[in-house]
């Protein structure tokens, strides 16, 4: 490394930025494949039940399944409207 290289800004090349973004997309897609088949239907049914009591839109309910070595966790996030 020369003296002048020390003061130059180190910019990420567009190729490395594109590679990093692609890795994020691939990881996200792999995560989607591991979800159970019943998850979309479960989300719709939960949405119907919640709508009996509160007016919400489809994007206000999120259902995810997290897995680790010993168990699976069903995570339900509902954004309730303000009154």
From Swiss-Prot:
InterPro entries: MinE, MinE_sf
Keywords: Cell cycle, Cell division
GO biological process: cell division; regulation of division septum assembly
Signal peptide: none
Classification via Pfam families: MinE (PF03776)
Function: Prevents the cell division inhibition by proteins MinC and MinD at internal division sites while permitting inhibition at polar sites. This ensures cell division at the proper site by restricting the formation of a division septum at the midpoint of the long axis of the cell.
Family listed: Belongs to the MinE family.
Descriptive protein name: Cell division topological specificity factor
Organism for this UniProt entry: Marinobacter nauticus (strain ATCC 700491 / DSM 11845 / VT8) (Marinobacter aquaeolei)
């Amino acid at each position: 490394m020369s003296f002048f290289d020390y003061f130059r800004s180190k910019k990420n090349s567009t190729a490395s930025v594109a590679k990093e973004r692609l890795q994020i997309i691939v990881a996200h897609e792999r995560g989607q494949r591991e979800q159970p088949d019943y998850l979309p239907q479960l989300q719709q049914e939960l949405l119907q039940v919640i709508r009996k009591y509160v007016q919400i839109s489809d994007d206000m309910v999120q259902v995810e399944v997290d897995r680790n070595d010993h168990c699976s966790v069903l995570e339900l996030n509902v954004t309730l409207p303000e009154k």
